Structures are given as C-alpha cells and as structure tokens.
Amino acid sequence: DATGTIDTVVPTYISEIVEEVAFVARSNPKIDKRSGVSQRLPITCLENVVSNAERRALASGETTAVPRVTDLYAALPSITGKFELEYEGELRGADNVAREVIRTAVGQVFDGWFTNVDTRPVIEWFDLGGTLQLGDATPSEELLEQTGQIQGLLELAEHARVKRTDPAPLV
C-alpha cells in the first residue's frame, strides 16, 4: 500500500514445519548431540522465512506476505548457525545437512496433514509430464495460475485449510 506496510499471514503448516525442523535436527545423527540444537533455531528460522516472504511481496507489489515451503531454504544460514555437526555431518557439509533436515520436516508435516487423503491425481499429473516453472520470486497470482492447472491440487489445498476463494497470496 501507500505506506509500504505489508500484512503477513503465516499458514499453520509453515509454523508446524519450522517447529519440525528443530525436532528433526535434534534427532539427526549428523548433528552433534553434545552441543545440541539451539532453542532459538525455530525462532530465527521463522523470522527468515517471513522475511523472505515479505521481500517477495514487496518486489511483486503485493500487500500480503504469505510464506511458502520454498522460503524455508532462505533460512538455511539461520538453521546451520544453530547447530554443530558430527564428523559425518562435516563431511556432507552444513548446508546439505540442513537441506536434508528441511526435506524430512516437510515430509513429516505433509504426512500428518494428508494421511488418508488421495494424492494420486496430483502425482498422476506430474507422471503424465506436467511441469511447473516457478522461482522464489514468482508472484502469487502467477503461482496460482500455474498450480491451478494441476488436477486435484486445489482439493488437497483445502485439507491444509486453504480456500479457493482466498486472495492469491493465501492460496
């Protein structure tokens, strides 16, 4: 808007994934248990996730910033700065370990939200050659336009408490 302020809406599943990142990191054998995982990890991770969403909203001229799962990768420095690695983790590198932690956390939260939900139409769409060309800076309207062509995706989104009638940044 004219004042440059942006409303921020953090979807529940994003908050859950950020919390799960901390739990997964604490149980990851590549992360040093003696040093532990900082209790600030989820706080700084969420701050970075929200910051990336706000950056995208400002660049796109949107008035609402809504973090996406991909925004978790913008938080890599804040994640890697909150734990120390075991020898095996050192060999893989902090970024790779953090990416593994994010992937695991996303998968676990996804499984929790979509247990007993038929995801086959979405999988089939991709199996039949469906592709998306989306970047970190893709505006919400364009993201919605591209993902709207995936059969069954909006029905799945409703399980994540997303309504088809929500403004583009929220869908």
Predicted regions mapped to residue ranges:
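Conserved AAA+ ATPase small/helical "lid" subdomain
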Residues: A2-A57, E62-V66
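C-terminal engagement/docking regions of AAA+ P-loop ATPases
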Residues: R34, E54-V171
